A protein has these predicted regions:
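Terminal, intrinsically disordered low-complexity segments enriched in charged/polar
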Residues: 26-125, 298-349, 442-517
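Residue-level signature for tetratricopeptide repeat
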Residues: 134, 163-168, 200-201, 402, ...
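Generic helix N-cap/helix-start motif at coil->alpha-helix transitions
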Residues: 120-129, 153-163, 187-196, 222-229, ...
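Long, internal scaffold/assembly segments composed of regular secondary structure
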Residues: 229-412
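Structural motif corresponding to the intra-repeat A-B loop/turn of tetratricopeptide repeats
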Residues: 138, 171-172, 204, 406, ...
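Extended amphipathic alpha-helical segments with heptad-repeat/coiled-coil character used for oligomerization
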Residues: 176-269
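Solenoid-repeat scaffolds in large eukaryotic assemblies
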Residues: 141-144, 174-178, 208-213, 409-415, ...
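Solenoid-like repeat scaffolds
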Residues: 70-80, 109-120, 146-156, 181-190, ...
Length: 568
């Protein structure tokens, strides 16, 4: 019997050569890319020759897209670690709760560095290709695409090509992904290549070939892609084709949803990765409400930039009666248009006390709708335009916290200085002092017992049920950055003990050995664990590990982020 990959390749190529162009279709999918009757021959690259950016064999695992000006980590990043240890850690990375951890993981995976050691006889994917796949998993689509592009022309197996293909399918226009499919016909035996080809045929309006491609996949016993089959059927006129689908969506499914001008079902949307959510948000083929919902979720998890969400908010149009009182409309409306109205309400106010007040009102509504974090990030440029004045100081605490979330420490400090001279709420400096200290601002008053005691007393008055937990969190964070808060210590309430966890034990050992790259990946694993990611002692242990591994600034960023997430 003919071997499966050979049969699949021959069948697909024969299908492409023999199939006639699709007939014109009345109510068929919109043609997003030009149709094609033949496959372009794959580009031939001489192995081992450096030509037009092609990597020689000894260079491909070292490939990266950063330099020191753009945040690259040392070239010895992976020294002392092994592929056997690192590959499972890279395979498990996710966007996570903390932007600071995601950023240091991004820098590690995107930095050019000597690869870790491999055991004799180990057969593993290219390390650079594995790093590109990790970048895609944490939602860094552009970085994944750039790194995969660098190595895909040389890579003999499918890992880099698969990453590149998925990253390209996440773009609003599927044409580059389909060009990549056509340029890599040598991979026709790969199931995902065959699925990608069907997607390209379907979005081009060539449903006859798409159906034939699915039939060939069934004949060759390629694992069924339930969503792909359903989406082709939907485009072919079956209105209920999506009913009952339960599998997870993948990047190559999104162009088909856009071509059908339909949103993924709610259950499927809720399970999308940050990269896929950002893709839906950026794709004009989806309805604006769908795009805003996707952007809000992606922005809240730092999977998308807040400015992209701001642009979507700004693109929503309103009736004159709605424009007359956007805040009232937002309070009554429940959907994405309500958040767009809030944004427009804030933007309509001149920078100054009026905008500060409008932002405070908008945040209250956004918090009730469950999108407060995303809305803050979307409105950050509007907040930065508000000049620090005594007239707007009543909102300084909210504005400082918003600025610190996006690391605008200088602007936040100017608002704090306004509070220090007596403007705004009397307890403002006590509330904000520890946050600015964690942000790296040298505050002489933080050396005074009165400042910390005032902060502790405020927590007891403002939120009694959470006061003790917040005091423990601040004590743990200050201790982790090397500034023990003696005035907050209580002999009857010692610092919480570090949880007994194999993840924490492994992180501690790795940091002690100064294995920078492995420490970063293990820190991400700790803070992805549900029982650890909000635990004060676990967060503090992670900060200490990063500091010991030579990443003190990143540890401090994590401390500030954890404090803000805990409501300090």
């Amino acid at each position: 019997m003919t071997d499966f990959p050979v049969r699949a390749t021959l069948a697909l190529i024969a299908c492409l050569a023999a199939a006639q162009p699709a007939a014109a279709q009345g109510n068929r999918p919109i043609r997003l890319i030009p149709g094609t009757d033949s496959m372009a021959a794959p580009e031939r690259v001489e192995r081992g020759v450096r030509n037009d950016g092609v990597l020689a064999p000894t260079e491909r695992d070292v490939a990266g897209i950063l330099d020191f000006a753009t945040g690259a980590l040392p070239a010895t990043l992976w020294a002392g670690s092994t592929r056997k240890t690192l590959d499972p850690l890279i395979g498990a990375v996710a966007a996570g709760r903390y932007a600071s951890i995601r950023d240091i993981v991004r820098r590690a995976l995107a930095s050019p560095a000597s690869p870790p050691a491999m055991e004799p006889g180990e057969k593993l994917p290219d390390f650079a290709a594995s790093r590109a796949a990790g970048l895609l998993r944490i939602g860094e689509t552009d970085a994944a695409r750039q790194l995969a592009t660098r190595i895909a022309r040389f890579q003999p197996e499918d890992t880099a090509h698969a990453v590149l293909r998925e990253a390209l399918f996440l773009a609003p226009d599927p044409a580059p992904a389909c060009e990549q499919i056509r340029a890599t016909a040598a991979l026709a035996g790969q199931p995902d290549w065959a699925r990608g080809l069907v997607v390209c045929q379907a979005v081009a309006g060539d449903l006859a070939r798409a159906r034939l491609g699915l039939a060939l996949q069934r004949e060759q016993k390629i694992a069924a892609d339930d969503w792909l089959q359903r989406l082709v059927a939907l485009l072919d006129g079956a209105p209920r084709a999506l009913d009952g689908a339960k599998a997870d969506l993948r990047p190559h499914h999104l162009p088909l949803f856009a071509a059908a001008k339909t949103a993924p079902p709610v259950a499927a949307m809720s399970a999308l990765s940050p990269a896929m959510l950002a893709s839906v948000a950026a794709n004009p083929g989806f309805a604006i409400e769908t795009r805003i919902r996707a952007a809000e979720t992606a922005t809240a998890s730092f999977g998308a930039d807040g400015r992209a969400l701001a642009d979507l908010y700004a693109s929503v149009s309103f009736q004159p009666r709605e424009m007359a009182d956007l805040l009232a409309f937002a309070a009554q409306e429940q959907g994405p248009r309500s958040r767009a109205a809030l944004y427009r309400h804030v933007r309509s106010q001149a920078p100054g006390p009026g905008r500060a007040s409008a932002f405070a009102q908008a945040i209250q509504v956004a918090e009730k709708r469950g999108v407060g974090r995303a809305f803050r990030r979307a409105a950050i440029d509007l907040v930065r335009e508000i000049p620090p004045t005594s007239e707007a100081a009543e909102h300084a605490v909210l504005l400082v916290r918003t600025l610190l979330i996006e690391r605008h420490t200088a602007e936040a400090t100017r608002w704090y200085d306004i509070l220090k001279v007596g403007a705004g709420p009397a307890d403002g400096t006590a509330l904000l002092g520890p946050l600015l200290f964690l942000a790296g601002v040298p505050l002489p008053e933080m050396g005074s017992s009165q400042t910390l005691l005032a902060w502790r007393d405020l927590q007891g008055r403002l939120d009694p049920p959470r006061a003790q937990a917040r005091v423990r969190m601040l004590r743990s964070l200050l201790d982790a950055v090397g500034a023990r808060a003696l005035d907050l210590e209580d002999a009857t309430d010692p610092l919480p003990a570090e949880p007994s966890s194999p993840l924490l034990a492994a992180l501690r050992r790795t940091a002690e050995q100064r294995l920078m790259g492995e420490t970063i990946l293990r820190a991400a694993a700790v803070l992805a664990e549900p029982g650890l990611r909000e635990n004060a002692a676990a967060i503090a242990a992670t900060i200490r590990a990063l500091t010991e591994a030579g990443l003190a600034d990143d540890g401090r960023s994590l401390a500030l982020e954890a404090a803000l997430a805990a409501g300090l």
